[in-house]
A protein has these predicted regions:
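Structured alpha/beta or helical-core interaction and ligand-binding surfaces enriched in interleaved
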Residues: 1-195
Length: 195
């Protein structure tokens, strides 16, 4: 039980650079799951249509609770491809949270990013390092890049993008420092609650 601890190890205003550094860290994983988690908040119709093209069949949800005329929670169920812009505009902002086969959508996802917060998460397993008494734990280990944010839990919006390494629930600053050094960086702040 519990959540991983996420350490910020790279920050930039260049989304492609953040993605590239995240991929360099993913290459260090002893194992990487076959699926990646993709999350994006969409604030414009253009952004919504771009993301729908990248993630065909994705489900979109309202950001925040919306109540219909019957007093029940509203659901977004319009076809993004065929609905007129003016109708979609009234439903924004929306978000999507999807899993995709690793390697199938990440680059197109980054290219389609708008100004909303977004994230890609790769779950995996860091290699064991018995000399340092560090052992990977698949439930917690991985890499995450948060676009327009500096919070592993997708908190407040920022201009920059942040790459996190996730380690076990007790934290592992020495491992995070080693991983950061691999990409020419350093741990940029306190550990955060991860996934």
């Amino acid at each position: 039980m519990g959540n991983s601890r996420a350490y910020p190890v790279f920050r930039t205003t260049d989304a492609t650079a953040a993605y590239t550094q995240a991929m360099r860290l993913c290459a260090l994983l002893a194992e990487c799951e076959d699926e990646v988690g993709l999350m994006a908040e969409l604030e414009t119709v253009e952004d919504l249509r771009k993301m729908a093209a990248v993630l065909p069949g994705a489900t979109f949800h309202y950001v925040g609770v919306r109540t219909g005329s019957n007093g029940h929670s509203g659901w977004f169920d319009l076809d993004v491809a065929t609905t007129e812009d003016v109708v979609l505009e009234a439903h924004l902002p929306l978000y999507t949270l999807e899993d995709a086969a690793r390697g199938s959508a990440e680059e197109r996802f980054v290219a389609a990013l708008g100004q909303g917060t977004a994230a890609i998460g790769w779950h995996g397993l860091w290699p064991d390092d018995p000399e340092a008494d560090q052992y990977g734990i698949a439930k917690y280990d991985g890499v995450q890049v948060v676009f327009h944010g500096d919070d592993a839990q997708w908190g407040r919006w920022t201009e920059h993008h942040t790459v996190f390494v996730h380690v076990d629930k007790w934290g592992d600053l020495p491992r995070a420092e080693k991983l950061a050094a691999h990409i020419g960086g350093e741990v940029l702040g306190e550990e955060q609650l991860g996934w």
